[in-house]
Each structure stands twice: as structure tokens, then as C-alpha cells.
Amino acid sequence: MTEPAKRGRGPGRPRDEQNTERRRRELIEAAYRVFTTKGYAAASTADIAAEVGIGYGTFYRYFDSKRAILDDVVDYGLDRLLTEIAGDVFEPAALDHEITVDELIRTWSGAVERMCHIAESDPALMQAMLFELPGIDDELNTRILGLGGILAATVDRFLSRAVDSGVIRDDVNTGDVGWMLLALTIPPVMRTLQGGGETDRRRYIDTAVAVLTPGLRSLEANS
């Protein structure tokens, strides 16, 4: 007698695991919306649960507290920012070719433009990620500063190769330049959040480029 076929889920992750991941994702996205509209301090776990449309107690099946979900919210927000701002700039293929000063400046200018466009279209995101969330506690400050260090180190890698090839002057500290370029992206974003428009942004970028370009080019190229 043939044994009846047993019904099973087949390959892949168990349904419970998939449902858990889906619910966690929903809660993270809901917390992101709540934190960027109400502010982290004013928001509650009940607000997050209501945003998803679930009971208050269900939140605690997935996260222990409002602070516990914050790390995932920060990761979610940073992923959005980096994807929209950097694009494929930091992909391995983009890091392997020799960069020129003009290309570096174009990359920086493009990043500034995209950050300002985000500040126009989603000002709550920029306000939260740049100003509100970093001040919550030391642990979060360390994480965000660590990300800045990674980005600055990536720029340093670009610049070090350009120094070796003679494109960029060899008497500048490329690590410091990486941090300077990151810092220079903040003022136009703040101006945009305060209502500054395209003309103001373009003037800032042109001024920064006029200062940066001769300061980075090799002495031979400037002569």
C-alpha cells in the first residue's frame, strides 16, 4: 500500500520566521514615521503600535522598549540616506579606478545636491537623522560617528591613490580632507531646511568648489 504523501512547506524559511521578519519590518517602518513626525521624546510604543494597527502588547513581542527599536530605525533611515545620496559611488567597482580632482568635486557636489533635495522632499528625515536622534544617548552618538568615520575613510582611500598618482598634492592629510568634505555637506542642508532655494545652494557649492579645487590639485597642476 502506498503511503499517502505528507504535506509540508518544502524548502525555504518557516512561515513563522517570515511572519516575524515581516512584522518587525512593519514596526520599524512605523517607528520611523512616528519618530520623524512626533519626535522621539514625544513618541510612545503605543503610537508605534497604533501606526501599524496592532494591539499595544503586540509591540513587546518583537522589541523590549522604544529605545530597543531605535537602533533599527536609525539603520533604516541611514540606509535610505546613503542609497539616495551615494548611489553606486561606494561600490567596489567605483573604488578601483583612479580618481581625478574634478571627479572628486563632481561626486561631492552631486551628494550635496541630493542631500538638499531630500531635505526639501522629506525634511523630517533630515531633521531627525542630523539633529534630533544623535543627541539621545552616547551609544547612538558613537554609532553615527562611526558611520562618519567609515565614509571619511572611503574618501581617504580615493584620495590616497590620487596622491600616489600625482593628481592630488602630497602635502595634505587625506584623512582630514575626508572629514572636511563630510562637514562641508551640512551647511547647505541646514539652509535648505530653513527655506533656502536652488540659487542659494548653487552659490554655496560654487564657492566651496572654488576653494577646494586649487587646494587639492598637485602643485604642478596649479602652476
Segments from the language model and where they lie:
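Short, hydrophobic secondary-structure boundary micro-motifs
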Residues: 127-130, 167, 171, 193
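Amphipathic alpha-helical interface segments
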Residues: 30, 34, 51, 58, ...
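Amphipathic alpha-helical packing segments from all-alpha helical-bundle domains
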Residues: 79, 83, 118, 128, ...
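Hydrophobic alpha-helical connector segments
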Residues: 72, 86-121, 174, 178-181, ...
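C-terminal peripheral helix-coil segments that are non-catalytic and often amphipathic
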Residues: 1-11, 113-117, 121, 153, ...
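Helix-turn-helix
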Residues: 26, 34-68, 72
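Generic hydrophobic, amphipathic alpha-helix propensity
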Residues: 19-32, 48, 69, 73-77, ...
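Short helix-capping/turn signature of helix-turn-helix
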Residues: 63, 130-136
